């Protein structure tokens, strides 16, 4: 597994959404398994809004923590409602595809972070 990141632009901010073991653990705690969460967020049938919003929140908050550590900043984590607003503006289906792609890229790569 390798840390993977996408940029999410919302209004005047750019968020880095990460998928790594920390996010994987949070998703497993909330939804049981990564597979169960993935089934809820896959495009096709109606995606589970709570699953997508929660996953996006975990990923953005991990990015905020990493940026805070790397840059000595003190940006506050986003809330569930803020993640929902971001998702609403960006589009549910498009964002679901992006975050599912992020997860697939991370877990399909056996390389370590360098």
Predicted regions, residues:
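Short linear motifs in exposed loops
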Residues: 18-19
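Active-site- and interface-proximal helix/loop "cap" or "latch" segments in soluble metabolic
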Residues: 47-49
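Short, hydrophobic/amphipathic alpha-helical patches that form generic packing surfaces
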Residues: 51-62
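Charged interaction scaffolds used for protein-protein
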Residues: 1-9, 29-45, 68-114
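Short strand-coil-strand connectors
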Residues: 11-13
């Amino acid at each position: 597994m390798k840390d993977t990141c996408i940029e999410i632009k919302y209004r005047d901010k750019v968020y880095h959404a990460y998928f790594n073991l920390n996010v994987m653990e949070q998703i497993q705690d909330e939804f049981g398994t990564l597979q169960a969460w993935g089934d809820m967020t896959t495009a096709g049938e109606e995606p589970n809004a709570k699953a997508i919003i929660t996953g996006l929140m975990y990923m953005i908050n991990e990015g905020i923590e990493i940026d805070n550590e790397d840059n000595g900043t003190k940006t506050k984590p986003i809330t569930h409602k803020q993640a929902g607003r971001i998702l609403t503006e960006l589009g549910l289906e498009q964002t679901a595809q992006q975050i599912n792609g992020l997860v697939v890229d991370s877990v399909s790569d056996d390389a370590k972070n360098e």
